[in-house]
Amino acid sequence: MEAQLSAIEELVAEEINGIALAPYNDSRIRDKINLLSEQGIPVVTLNTDIENTRRIAYVGSHYTKSGSTAAGLLRLMTHGEVHVGIITGSSNILCHTERIAGFTESLKPFSDTIHIAEIVEVHDDEFESYEKTTVLLKRHPEINALYFVAGGVYGGCRSVKALGLQNQMRIVAYDMVPTTKELLRQGIISAVICQQPKLQGSKPLALLFTYLTTGELPDREQHYVAVDIRIRENCD
């Protein structure tokens, strides 16, 4: 978080005209965005949003909906008693908490058969994910499904393989990075939810360009990308 504040300060010192930012969900970042607005520097948030700021737009996933989608996928691919381990990045990242909220809310009507065993934070770190997933699965041997909310997918799946649990585990993750794609091909991961990363990268710049050249605000604040579900058969 300190690194993000420092990066913003460096950009302001270079007299930039606008910022596209994936914000850390912290009051200091919130205050900084509002200060930038007062200084006439527009901000577009991408990939994850932050509440109660004067950013001109957000481009990214509808995270509660993507969490609900993950819950729906899990229901379709499991039967009987299901015990889910949730592996997230950080409770200080809004998109991570919103995904979990959408996921758990959608599973409430099925709480007699689908249970949340535990939620662990791995801070998008593969080594931390490997270690904490190993501890999680040993502490809860009943877990037969994993929901990866953010990064750390490769490390967590390496743990599943090391424990020999790949054939009894259903795994849902996000974003088709090369390692995740390979795990999907191998059948370790059951489904991946993708979020149009190229659009998330290009749209904020287009919105900033239009605002800076014409003075026109975006026609809406939220620009949600489509939810794209991939399984082994359509991962290429």
Show where each model-derived region lies.
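Hydrophobic alpha-helical segments within soluble ligand-binding/sensing domains
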Residues: 59-84, 129-130, 180, 196-213
